[in-house]
Structures are given as structure tokens and as C-alpha cells.
């Protein structure tokens, strides 16, 4: 078997979500161990160890991942990743000019935010690409994918280059920078074109919860947009780097060129991404945000797409932040290029030669504006001035009117320019002297440097002037080692001067220690410098730097300071002793001889100096540490890794031998949480020589079990280490060892990429029939992991091919699932009876082969006589599988093999529906042509969705074609076959918002825009908020006031679903605001009753002339009454704000405040009493018949405690009498209490009572008589509907009427409930089916109410009440 390439292995392992984990650890390892005293190999080693821990996960080494070779990644891929990262870090360590620092910060911050989420999407996007088959969409998405892959590949390739190659690559004519700049152009291979095509065609807007194509395209547009943004930041990063590079080289012309490119790239991309304010054009991010908001607003998101909603919110936040970041940055640079107004005169008496000043040389000056974080380009160079006898001229220039600082640059002849100083806003004279002082201190010729220093100081040079990376003359002298200058500086300076840090936190003593200038270090210590000060990024002290460089003399001078802390830690917890490991034996010897040194000191990751010496494979250094009697050779890091573990991981054979020979060594120490020993690691990382040595050592336990009971033998099989296995067999190891999951070595070999190991283990007597914890034999695993060779080897050895695992699956099922035809043939040759054998999911081999599209396998099984109509537990069958995937040839083949064409899955979907839903027109046409086998007019009893009676396949097929937005199939059904009325396609297209289908049906098939059903297409589109469809229908003559079903209009539908934009469109197109619906409510009242605050506000504010804010419904209720009923304080405030009359009384003589008081809604009462201004009035309670007739709202019914109490009290009063009734009902799952409550609601509606007031109000005789009679008659009608004669015999309705009348007349209203419940309890023959019928009859009476003094609107309210109860 050939080894997988790194790319192939990475792809396989990424499917196990390991690749990203490794890459993330590799990316972070630089940051985590950035101050490590050695990088290169040591960081790679620690990264590998860290990844092994990640690989082990919660403690168990994942067998499948190891078998795939994923454990190699820490040493294969990590090396590539780290090399790339180190090259990148090396480049970034170059100093940035001040002008580029802020840009670099912005770019780094933004790249990390965008790239993090883009990398997370990368793997998923490949899956999306493979699954998109749509002819229109696939080419567009492919462009996004192709560009993204090219961008990633080029970006990573460039970043891995060394500095010179990196520069050459970036500056290639017509190279990657130019190509990436074209991403925002409409070129065919750009990103702009496909992204806007998707947006404009609305391909990323899902029509239904099952619109998988749209969800995939949505994923694509998000990935593409993030790539677009990444391209911008990548370009900014590269142009910033190039500008900085040439700034450091002194090529200011090149610097200006790239500085200008940097700004232009930003402005161009800013315009494309967030639009141009001048033209009001929306940018890409705005369009994408609109798409996200549209998708988020779809109601079906709650139906199983919660993770999608979470993703949408995440992306909305991300793109909003990116937009804010880009919009907030007006420019990357100052737009103005400074003019050079400098007048140069030599006024100082400083004679040449000094520093760079030599007679006959020519000097030029250029300036740059600096304003907060923005910088301009560097201006043109001044005319040259010849140097004649004098140096350090004075520059005079006008004060900048905008109060910007001016940076001054100097260049001699064609040499590298230097920054020589900064002119403050109110300064007009500048003496060019301070840079020469800095240069004098930097001069390696200390005598010349000192002489120049003295002359410049005497002429007023400033020792505090700041230059490169914030360094002063103190830093320069510390680096050059000029002790005379340093003596002068320390004599005249303040304490703060000698402790002044540069931009990275290096003080002069840091620089001296890093340069090995022991004398300067000694001088600075005596001057009182802080000897333990730390750098900013890595928190290194001067002692860290001296130790790393191996400067023994400097170390000794530092140690003479009484304040020195020899164990001071850096950012990652490394002490100077750790750094000394890199410095060598001499410096290490000097360290361990110091009093107070901790030779076993650990870093934050738990690494000791001895760990580092072994990882560095530097045994002389390790031996030096061993000379300390206190050294702990078995010290462990945070993962319980000893030095021996690292030697085994790295494959250092000689170091491993040295360690094993140490008397105190613990050869069997195990890591945590994986419990892996050095032997485990040597095998895991394929270091055979180390593993063989450890196997032969008497100190090593070769049967040691890691977490999950994985032994070295198991690992040797997983990694295919034949030589190691041979040695294990020689020493008599048990070859049937089992892991915690009962894997034997033979199981692992059967799953591995080393089939030859199966034969080797069989020759050693491995158990063929051993089972894992899931009941799988080696043969089971070989077939289910697709290992054909291993399976065939096992089959030759008289293995049991009928052995099922815990899922009832046999080797034949695994062979079928993975298309192992040769294995299936071998099994069926041995035993033909397994051809149709089912697993626990009722899957046969044929069904599994079909589900996985193994065509040859399917045909082979059918040719042998397999049952072609096999169905599993979900109803999946071969014909359904191939139809779903669009394989016409296999559909034809199965037709010819007499497959049942009407076979359906558990959702009632047959092959025809699958073809329709997935847009496979070829299969649809073929099916329609096979009339002798398939007839779409056949009644389908498997489905009932959207069909009130018996419907044919044709009905569901047309409905599906429209719902799933398959326009070509719709055209075929409607246009070609002429089925205009089946499933009302125009209505369905409007319901689901498929505008192109709507247009086709109206324009090409000339269907009426108002349809022929009670509900019009406009009704459906309005209710579901499909703006484009609503606008189109109206433009094409749809009647906006046409009746919808249930006596509503389109605007009513839109209002009840809170579709504000639809309401606005309808309002502008002639909707009748005075028209009342079946609830006797206008659109305005409907908005209030629907709690649609935004719509109510819009109607009041924008359509005031069309509405009457004080209008009343049939019960004389105003919007304020309704808002109180629904306890909507926000709505109440809105109505009061716009002047609604609070004094209006409803049909029961109640104001809104009365109702709030009756229902004890304290917040509303308080507001209406105290905060409603001029409309407030004193409330006077009136007693009498109005209380009895007051009709309460549904919310009050559900809130009532009185009814529940009365009902429960009554039921519990006679448990014995009701026992049989209750038991029977309970056994039949009948909601008796709910039924009684429903009847109670019915009766209270008839009596116009609502829930009974607690105070005993008596009613007038006439009203009480009428109400009692109405209640009794309706109660009798309901019971008579049961056609139960004993019911009529057992209930005395005259007595019922008498008791109800007495209760109402005396004001004891709550007794009505008891009277009716008592009557029901007296019916001993009432059965559960009677209760069910009772409920249905109660509901049916909503359409046949005839009671005294009950208005039509009251009946409608009553009907709505019953409807809501029924729904609940």
C-alpha cells in the first residue's frame, strides 16, 4: 500500500475535525511559547506533544484517527505549518515605521476576526460544493470555491517564503497582488460577479425549511464574502509590509509608491464593501446583511433550524462589526502630500568632517505630515545642498496651519535616508543635529564616536531625542559598547533617561546584555539602572538575554547586582536558567553554581531546563545539569511528560539510551490524560530504533496499558510497525490483548491500511471470532471500514461470515454499504442465504448498496434474485434512493426489474415526489411516459398534507414542484401537460414567495392574478410577507380589496402576521381602510387586536386621514378597549399619545379604565389614571345588569382562578359517584376537565357573562329568564346530539332551567357551573366516545348560534373563542 500524501492525509483527518485542531495549535504555539529560548525543533516538539494530548482527547487515544495516520500530522504537517509561521514572524519582527504601525494593528486585528470564522467554514464549504447539483447555481458557486481555494493556496505559499523570495513574489509584474486587486471587478474569475449574481437572483433565500439548495448557497455567499474581506486585509497587509520594507531600506520613493497603493486599495475595497456615500450605492456587505435579515425573518426558522438562526446572528454581528470598522476608517493615509518649503542654512559652528558630513557631499531633505494615527506620503526631496566645511544646518519652514507634526528625513548623495527629527505644530526652526549624536554613539570606532559626541553635545544636541523604534542615544551607546559616551551620559542624565525603554520595552541595559557589553552593563548597574526590568512582549530581563547568548562575563556582571533575581520568569514562565540551555555549557555551569538557583524550575507549561536540554538533543548540556545533585530527571510537565517522553517522541536514540542508563530513571512514567509511556510514543511516532531499544530494556514494561487499555502492541499494529511487531512476537507478547472497547490487534489490523498485518497476526494464532464491545468481529470491521483486502484474507480462513454486530449487521451489509463487490461475491459464494438478510433497521444488502449508490453492487444483487422492493424502518427503498439522487438509468433499470413504482417511505414520498422535489425533470418525464407502469392520476393514500379528501399523485406532485421552487418541472406540469388547476399553482407560488414561478404562470400561462379560489394569490403572498410577489401581483391588476377566506382581505392577513412592509405596499395601492372583516373590525382595529404595534403606529402616523382612531367594533369597543384586553401597555401609550378618547364606553358601558380595574391590571390602571393627561377622568362604578352582561376577553378566561377552583371543588365533592366515569375517561386519554371547561366557556358566551364576578350582583327578571332559557336549550341540544336515549331520560332539563334561573336572579352566578357539572355527572352511561363527540358538537355550534340580544359580532367573537380553544 502506498503511503498517503500529506494533502490526502490532511483531507481525511480533517473529516475527523483533527486538521483544524492541529492547525490552530500550530498557529498558537508561536504565541504560547514565543519567548522560548530556542525555536525551531523545540517548538515543533512541544507542539507535537500538545497535539498528541489533543489527539487523545478526554484521555482515550482515538483508534480510528490513529489508524488513518492522523497522529503523524504533528510531525508532518506541523513542520510545514511552523516553518511558514516562523518565516512570517521573522518578517513581522522587522521594525515598522510610525506611519504603518496603526495600519498594521488594524489589519492584524481584522484578519484574525475574519479568518477565524472563514477557516471554520472552509471544510464545510467543500461538502456544500460536492452536494450542489443545480445547473444554474453550481457554476456560480464553483467560481466562489475556485477563487477561495486559489486565494488560500497562494496566500499560504507566499507567507512561507524567505524574505527575499517573499519580496520578489509580491513585486512580480501582473502577479498575485494585482490579481487579488481584481477581485472587486466584474471579471469572470473574480469574486464580485458570482456574489452579486447570487444576491440579485435571490438564490440564497430559502423558500421553505427543506430548501437545502438555498441554505447551501447561503453558506456559499457567506464564505465568499468573508473571503472577499480577507482579500482586502491581505492586500493591506502586503502593501503595508512592502512600504515598511522600503522605509527600512531607505528607499522612500518605493515607500511612497506602496504607501499610496495601500490607501488606494483601502478606498477601492471600502467602496465595494460598504458603498459610496456620494452615490448612495449599497456595498456587498450591505447586500449580504439584507440577505441574512431576510432569511432570519422567515417564520420556518423555528421548525428545526435553531442552529441556523444562531449562525445567522453570528454572521450578522460579524459583518456589522466589519462594516463599522471599515466605515469608521475614512482613509489609511493623509491625502495631502507635503510641499518642501525648507530653507537650509549652516549656522552652527560645527566643522566637517563629522559623522556623515563630508565636504563635497550633497544633502537633501524631505518631510512627512503626521496627524494622530494618519500619515501622509513623504514629499519630494529638496534641491541638493553641497556640504562645505560646516555640518548640522538649520531648517526653516512655515508653521503647518492644520497643526500637524512634520517628520524630517535626510539623505546624503544616494545613501539610505534617515529620520532626523520631528517638528512640532508651532515650531518653525529645526536644527539637524540630534541624529548625528545618535549616530556618533552607534559608531563602532569608539574613539571617533566619542570625539563627535563631545562636539555635538557642546553644540546643544539633545540626548533625549528618539529615533529608530523609540531608541535614544543611551540605547545606541549600549549597543556599540562605547563606555566613554555612556559615562558622559550617566553623569549628565536623570534616572529616567537610563531606564528609558524603546517601543519593545528594551532599556539600555537590555541592549547591552543582548550585545554582550559587560562593561556597559557594569556601568549601568552602578548608575542605578533597574536590573530586573522586562521587555513588553516577552517580559524578558537582561539576564534572560545574556543567558540565551551565552555571555558569561555579562552574566557575572549582572549577578553582582544585589537586586538581581536569578529566577525571574518571562511571559511563558521561563527563567534565565531555561535560556542558558541554549547558551551552552559554560553559561549553564555558571548558573548552576549560583546560590539560590532552582535547577528544576518549571515554566508555565511545566518544562524544566532538563526537558529543554533533551528536546534540544544536547547531551553535553544535559550532562552539565546532571552534575547538580538536585536535578530531577523524572520531572513532569503539565501533561505529565518527562524528558524520556520527549526523547522518544523525537526519535533521539542515543539520548534515549543515556536516559535509560540513568539509575533513577522512571522508564514507565505515563503522560496525562492518555497514560502513554515512552514506548507508546516511540511506536506512535514511528521511531522503530527507539522502540526496539526500549522493548529490549529490562526497565520497560511492554504490556503497559494506556488510557482505554491500549498497549504498545495495539499501537504497533495501528502504525504498521512490522519490525517492532516481530520483536514483540519474539519476546512472547500476548497477541490477543484487548482494549477497553475489546479491540484485539487483529481487529485493528482489519481496519488499518496494512492488510498484510492480518496474515501476520493470523499466522501467530490471533482469534478470528473475537468481538468488540459492539459485537463486531475482525471481518465485520474490515467490511464496514471498506478494507477489501483484509476482508478477503479473513474469508480465506474459514471465518464466520454470518456473525452480526449489535445493530444486526453482518459482513455482507458492510460490503454492500462500501461497494466491496469482490467481498460480497466471496460471501455469497459461501452462503447465498444472506442475500436478503435484514439488519435491525430492516436494511438488506441491496438497500444499503442503493442508499450508497453502488450501482454494480445493486445490479449484482438483483441478478442473484434480491428483493427489489425491500424497505427499511424509515421506508427507504432502492427506487427512492436513485430517484432522489437523480440517477435516471437506475430508475429505468428498476422499472424494468418490476420495482413497485408506488412504494413510499414513512413520510408518504414515492420515487416521483423525490424526483420532483429534487428537480430531476428527466425522471419526471420518463415516469410520465411509462403509463403502463405509472399513472399519476392514481389516488395516493400515503399522503394527506394539504389535501382535504382523497387526492391523486398529480396533486401532490404539482404542489411539491411549486413549494420546492422547481420551475422547470412546474413548466412541464402546467405548460406542457396543461394542468392549470391542479393544486392551484399560482396560489402556491404566491404562498411560498417564488416570484419567477408567479411571473411564469401570469405572463406565459396567462393565469388570473386573482385566481379562482376564496383565497387569492395576493392573500397568500401578503400573509407570508413576500414583498416581491405582492408588488408584482398588484402591478398586474390584483384586487387589493378582494375577499380572502374567512371573511378577511389581504391587508387583514398581512396585519395578523405583522407584515409591516406588505401593509405599506397595500396602503399605497388603494386598500379600503374602512372595510370591516368578519370580526367587524377595520384594519386599524385588527392591528391593535393582533398586537401589531409597528403597523398600528404606521396607520396612525401615516394614514391618519384614512382611519378614525376612536372607531368602534360591533361591541362598541375602541382600539383602547382592545389594547387593555390584551394587556398591551405599549399599545395603550401609543393610542393615548395620538389622542384616543378614553371616555368612550363599550356595549357593556365600560371604559378602558373600567376593564383594567375589573381585571386588576395594575400597571395599566396606574398609567390611565395618572399619566394619560387630559383624557383622564374619574371612574364611577355602576352596579346592576351591566355586570351580568359584560363580556370578557379570552385572556381573562385563561387567567381565571375561580372556575378552576369551583370545578375542582365540585368534582372532588363526590369521588365515589364519579369514579367509574373518571377512570374510564382517564384510561381513554379523554380530557374530561377540558371538556367541562369548554362547555362552561360556551355557556358563559351565551349568557354574555365572561368569568363570574365574585360580588353577588342580581340580574333583572327578564334578562335572567332569557339567559337561563338560552343556556338550557343549548345544553339540551348538545346532549341530544349524542343520540343517547338514556341521556334524555337521566337529565331533567326543566329542573336545570329552574336552577340556572334561580342562580342568575339571585346573583349567585358561580352556581351555573355546578348545575351543569352535576347534570353531566348524573349521566352514568356517558362513555369516552360520547365525550369526544361532545367536544366536536360544541365546536360545531359556532356556526349556528341564535340567542336573544346577541349581536353578530358577539357570535364571531364566540366562534373565535371556540376556535382558539380547539387549536390549543
Curated annotation (Swiss-Prot):
PROSITE patterns: ANK_REP_REGION, ANK_REPEAT. Homotetramer in membranes. This is Alpha-latrotoxin-Lg1a. Residues 1174-1177 are annotated as: Furin-like endopeptidase recognition region. The keyword Ligase does not apply. It is found in: Secreted; Target cell membrane. Is the main neurotoxin responsible for the human envenomation syndrome known as latrodectism that results from bites by Latrodectus species. The keyword Membrane applies. Residues 1178-1368 form a propeptide. Belongs to the cationic peptide 01 (latrotoxin) family. 03 (alpha-latrotoxin) subfamily. Pfam families: Ank_2 (PF12796), Ank_4 (PF13637). GO terms for cellular component: extracellular region; host cell presynaptic membrane; membrane; other organism cell membrane. Disulfide bonds join 392-1044. Presynaptic neurotoxin that causes massive release of neurotransmitters from vertebrate (but not invertebrate) nerve terminals and endocrine cells via a complex mechanism involving activation of receptor(s) and toxin insertion into the plasma membrane with subsequent pore formation. Binds to neurexin-1-alpha (NRXN1) in a calcium dependent manner, adhesion G protein-coupled receptor L1 (ADGRL1, also termed latrophilin-1 and calcium-independent receptor of latrotoxin (CIRL)), and receptor-type tyrosine-protein phosphatase S (PTPRS), also termed PTP sigma. GO terms for biological process: exocytosis. ANK repeats lie at residues 469-500, 504-533, 538-568, 572-601, 605-635, 639-669, 674-704, 708-737, 741-770, 774-803, 807-837, 841-870, 874-903, 907-936, 953-981, 982-1011, 1013-1042, 1046-1075, 1079-1109, 1115-1144.
Amino acid at each position: 500500500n502506498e503511503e498517503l500524501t500529506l494533502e490526502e492525509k490532511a483531507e481525511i483527518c480533517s473529516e475527523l475535525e483533527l486538521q483544524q485542531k492541529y492547525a490552530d495549535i500550530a498557529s498558537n504555539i508561536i504565541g504560547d511559547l514565543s519567548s522560548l529560548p530556542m525555536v525551531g525543533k523545540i517548538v515543533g516538539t512541544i507542539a507535537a506533544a500538545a497535539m498528541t494530548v489533543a489527539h487523545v482527547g478526554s484521555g482515550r487515544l482515538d483508534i480510528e484517527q490513529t489508524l488513518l495516520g492522523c497522529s503523524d500530522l504533528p510531525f508532518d504537517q506541523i513542520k510545514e505549518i511552523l516553518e511558514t509561521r516562523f518565516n512570517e514572524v521573522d518578517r513581522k519582527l522587522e521594525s515598522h515605521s510610525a506611519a504603518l504601525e496603526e495600519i498594521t494593528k488594524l489589519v492584524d486585528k481584522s484578519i484574525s476576526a475574519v479568518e477565524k470564522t472563514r477557516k471554520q467554514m472552509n471544510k464545510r464549504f467543500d461538502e456544500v460544493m460536492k452536494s450542489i447539483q443545480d445547473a444554474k447555481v453550481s457554476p456560480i458557486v464553483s467560481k466562489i470555491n475556485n477563487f477561495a481555494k486559489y486565494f488560500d493556496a497562494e496566500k499560504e505559499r507566499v507567507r512561507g517564503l524567505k524574505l527575499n523570495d517573499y519580496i520578489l513574489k509580491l513585486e512580480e509584474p501582473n502577479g498575485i497582488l494585482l490579481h487579488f486587486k481584481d477581485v472587486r471587478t466584474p471579471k469572470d474569475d473574480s469574486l464580485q460577479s458570482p456574489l452579486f449574481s447570487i444576491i440579485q437572483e435571490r438564490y440564497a433565500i430559502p423558500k421553505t425549511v427543506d430548501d437545502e439548495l438555498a441554505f447551501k448557497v447561503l453558506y456559499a455567499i457567506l464564505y465568499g464574502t468573508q473571503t472577499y474581506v480577507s482579500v482586502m486585509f491581505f492586500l493591506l497587509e502586503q502593501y503595508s509590509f512592502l512600504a515598511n520594507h522600503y522605509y527600512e531600506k531607505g528607499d522612500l520613493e518605493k515607500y511612497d509608491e506602496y504607501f499610496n497603493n495601500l490607501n488606494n486599495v483601502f478606498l477601492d475595497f471600502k467602496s465595494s464593501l460598504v458603498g459610496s456615500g456620494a452615490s448612495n450605492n449599497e456595498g456587498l456587505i450591505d447586500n449580504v446583511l439584507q440577505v441574512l435579515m431576510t432569511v432570519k425573518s422567515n417564520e420556518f426558522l423555528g421548525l428545526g433550524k435553531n442552529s441556523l438562526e444562531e449562525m445567522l446572528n453570528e454572521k450578522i454581528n460579524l459583518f456589522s462589526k466589519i462594516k463599522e470598522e471599515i466605515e469608521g476608517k475614512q482613509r489609511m493615509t493623509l491625502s495631502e502630500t507635503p510641499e518642501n518649503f525648507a530653507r537650509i542654512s549652516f549656522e552652527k559652528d560645527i566643522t566637517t568632517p563629522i559623522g556623515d558630513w563630508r565636504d563635497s557631499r550633497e544633502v537633501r531633505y524631505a518631510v512627512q505630515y503626521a496627524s494622530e494615527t494618519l500619515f501622509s506620503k513623504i514629499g519630494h526631496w529638496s534641491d541638493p545642498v553641497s556640504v562645505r566645511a560646516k555640518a548640522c544646518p538649520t531648517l526653516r519652514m512655515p508653521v503647518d496651519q492644520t497643526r500637524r507634526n512634520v517628520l524630517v528625513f535626510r539623505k546624503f548623495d544616494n545613501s539610505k535616508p534617515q529620520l532626523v527629527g520631528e517638528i512640532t505644530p508651532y515650531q518653525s526652526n529645526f536644527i539637524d543635529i540630534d541624529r548625528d549624536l545618535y549616530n556618533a554613539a552607534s559608531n563602532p570606532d569608539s574613539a571617533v564616536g566619542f570625539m563627535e559626541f563631545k562636539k555635538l553635545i557642546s553644540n546643544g544636541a539633545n540626548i533625549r531625542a528618539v529615533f529608530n523604534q523609540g531608541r535614544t542615544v543611551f540605547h545606541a551607546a549600549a549597543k556599540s559598547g562605547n563606555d566613554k559616551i555612556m559615562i558622559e551620559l550617566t553623569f549628565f542624565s536623570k534616572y529616567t533617561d537610563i531606564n528609558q525603554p524603546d517601543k519593545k520595552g528594551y532599556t539600555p541595559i537590555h541592549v547591552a546584555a543582548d550585545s554582550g557589553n559587560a562593561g556597559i552593563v557594569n556601568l549601568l548597574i552602578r548608575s542605578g539602572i533597574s536590573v530586573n526590568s522586562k521587555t513588553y512582549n516577552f517580559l524578558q530581563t537582561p539576564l534572560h538575554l545574556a543567558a540565551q547568548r551565552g555571555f558569561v562575563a555579562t552574566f557575572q556582571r549582572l549577578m553582582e547586582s544585589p537586586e538581581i533575581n536569578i529566577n525571574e520568569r518571562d511571559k511563558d514562565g521561563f527563567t534565565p536558567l531555561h535560556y542558558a540551555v541554549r547558551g551552552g555549557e559554560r553559561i549553564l555551569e555558571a548558573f548552576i553554581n549560583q546560590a539560590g538557583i532552582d535547577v528544576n524550575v518549571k515554566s508555565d507549561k511545566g518544562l524544566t531546563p532538563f526537558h529543554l536540554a533533551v528536546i534540544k538533543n544536547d547531551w553535553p548540556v544535559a550532562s552539565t545539569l546532571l552534575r547538580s545533585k538536585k536535578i530531577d530527571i523524572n520531572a513532569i510537565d503539565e501533561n505529565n511528560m518527562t524528558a524520556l517522553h520527549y526523547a522518544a517522541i523525537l526519535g533521539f536514540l542515543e539520548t534515549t539510551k543515556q536516559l535509560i542508563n540513568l539509575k533513577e530513571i522512571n522508564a514507565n512514567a505515563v503522560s496525562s490524560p492518555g497514560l502513554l509511556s515512552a514506548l507508546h510514543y516511540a511506536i506512535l511516532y514511528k521511531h522503530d530504533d527507539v522502540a526496539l531499544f526500549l522493548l529490549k530494556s529490562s526497565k520497560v514494561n511492554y504490556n503497559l496499558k494506556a488510557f482505554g487499555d491500549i498497549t504498545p502492541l495495539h499501537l504497533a499494529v495501528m502504525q504498521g510497525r512490522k519490525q517492532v511487531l516481530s520483536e514483540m512476537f519474539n519476546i512472547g507478547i500476548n497477541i490477543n490483548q484487548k482494549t477497553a472497547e475489546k479491540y484485539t490487534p487483529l481487529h485493528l489490523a482489519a481496519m488499518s491500511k496494512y492488510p498484510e498485518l492480518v496474515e501476520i497476526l493470523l499466522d501467530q494464532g490471533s482469534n478470528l471470532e473475537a468481538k468488540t464491545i459492539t459485537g463486531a468481529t475482525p471481518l465485520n470491521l474490515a467490511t464496514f471500514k471498506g478494507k477489501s483486502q483484509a476482508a478477503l484474507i479473513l474469508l480465506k480462513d474459514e471465518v464466520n461470515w454470518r456473525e452480526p454486530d449489535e445493530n444486526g449487521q453482518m459482513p455482507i451489509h458492510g460490503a454492500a454499504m462500501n461497494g466491496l463487490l469482490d467481498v460480497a461475491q466471496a460471501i455469497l459464494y459461501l452462503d447465498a442465504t444472506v442475500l436478503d438478510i435484514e439488519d435491525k433497521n430492516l436494511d438488506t444488502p441491496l438497500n444499503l448498496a442503493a442508499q450508497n449508490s453502488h450501482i454494480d453492487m445493486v445490479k449484482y444483487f438483483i441478478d442473484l434474485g434480491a428483493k427489489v422492493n425491500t424497505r427499511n424502518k424509515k421506508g427507504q427503498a432502492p427506487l427512492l434512493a436513485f430517484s432522489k439522487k437523480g440517477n435516471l438509468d437506475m430508475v429505468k433499470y428498476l422499472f424494468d426489474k418490476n420495482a413497485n413504482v408506488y412504494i413510499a417511505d414513512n413520510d408518504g414520498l414515492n420515487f416521483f415526489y423525490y424526483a420532483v422535489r429534487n428537480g430531476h425533470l428527466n425522471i419526471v418525464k420518463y415516469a410520465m411516459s411509462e403509463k403502463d407502469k405509472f399513472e399519476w392520476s392514481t389516488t395516493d393514500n400515503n399522503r394527506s398534507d394539504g389535501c382535504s379528501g382523497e387526492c391523486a399523485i398529480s396533486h401532490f406532485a404539482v404542489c411539491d414542484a411549486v413549494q420546492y421552487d422547481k420551475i422547470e418541472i412546474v413548466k412541464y406540469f402546467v405548460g406542457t401537460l396543461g394542468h392549470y388547476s391542479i393544486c392551484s399553482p399560482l396560489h402556491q407560488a404566491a404562498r411560498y414567495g417564488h416570484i419567477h414561478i408567479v411571473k411564469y404562470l401570469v405572463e406565459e400561462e396567462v393565469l388570473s392574478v386573482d385566481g379562482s379560489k376564496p383565497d387569492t394569490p395576493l392573500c397568500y403572498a401578503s400573509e407570508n410577507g413576500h414583498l416581491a410577489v405582492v408588488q408584482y401581483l398588484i402591478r398586474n391588476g390584483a384586487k387589493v380589496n378582494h375577499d380572502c377566506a374567512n371573511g378577511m382581505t389581504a391587508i387583514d392577513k398581512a396585519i395578523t402576521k405583522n407584515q409591516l412592509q406588505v401593509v405599506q405596499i397595500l396602503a399605497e395601492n388603494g386598500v379600503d381602510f374602512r372595510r370591516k372583516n368578519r370580526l367587524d373590525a377595520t384594519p386599524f382595529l385588527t392591528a391593535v387586536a393582533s398586537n401589531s404595534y409597528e403597523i398600528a403606529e404606521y396607520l396612525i402616523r401615516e394614514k391618519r386621514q384614512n382611519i378614525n382612531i376612536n372607531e368602534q367594533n360591533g361591541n362598541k369597543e375602541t382600539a383602547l378597549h382592545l389594547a387593555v384586553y390584551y394587556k398591551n401597555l405599549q399599545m395603550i401609550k401609543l393610542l393615548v399619545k395620538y389622542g384616543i378618547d378614553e371616555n368612550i364606553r363599550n356595549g357593556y358601558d365600560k371604559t378602558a379604565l373600567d376593564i383594567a380595574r375589573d381585571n386588576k391590571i395594575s400597571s395599566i390602571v396606574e398609567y390611565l389614571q395618572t399619566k394619560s393627561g387630559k383624557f383622564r377622568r374619574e371612574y364611577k362604578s355602576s352596579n346592576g345588569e351591566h355586570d351580568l352582561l359584560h363580556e370578557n376577553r379570552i385572556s381573562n378566561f385563561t387567567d381565571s382562578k375561580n372556575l378552576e377552583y369551583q370545578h375542582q371543588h365540585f368534582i372532588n365533592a363526590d369521588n365515589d359517584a364519579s369514579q367509574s366515569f373518571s377512570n374510564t375517561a382517564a384510561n381513554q386519554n379523554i380530557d374530561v376537565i377540558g371538556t367541562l371547561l369548554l362547555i362552561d366557556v360556551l355557556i358563559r358566551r351565551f349568557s354574555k357573562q365572561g368569568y363570574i364576578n365574585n360580588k353577588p350582583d342580581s340580574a333583572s327578571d327578564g334578562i335572567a329568564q332569557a339567559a337561563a332559557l338560552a343556556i338550557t336549550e343549548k345544553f339540551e341540544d348538545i346532549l341530544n346530539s349524542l343520540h343517547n336515549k338514556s341521556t334524555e331520560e337521566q337529565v331533567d332539563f326543566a329542573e336545570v332551567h329552574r336552577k340556572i334561573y334561580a342562580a342568575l336572579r339571585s346573583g349567585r352566578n358561580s352556581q351555573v357551573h355546578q348545575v351543569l357539572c352535576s347534570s353531566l355527572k348524573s349521566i352514568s352511561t356517558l362513555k369516552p366516545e360520547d365525550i369526544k363527540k361532545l367536544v366536536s358538537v360544541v365546536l360545531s355550534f359556532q356556526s349556528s348560534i341564535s340567542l336573544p340580544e346577541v349581536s353578530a359580532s358577539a357570535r364571531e367573537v364566540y366562534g373565535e373563542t371556540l376556535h382558539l380553544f380547539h387549536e390549543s
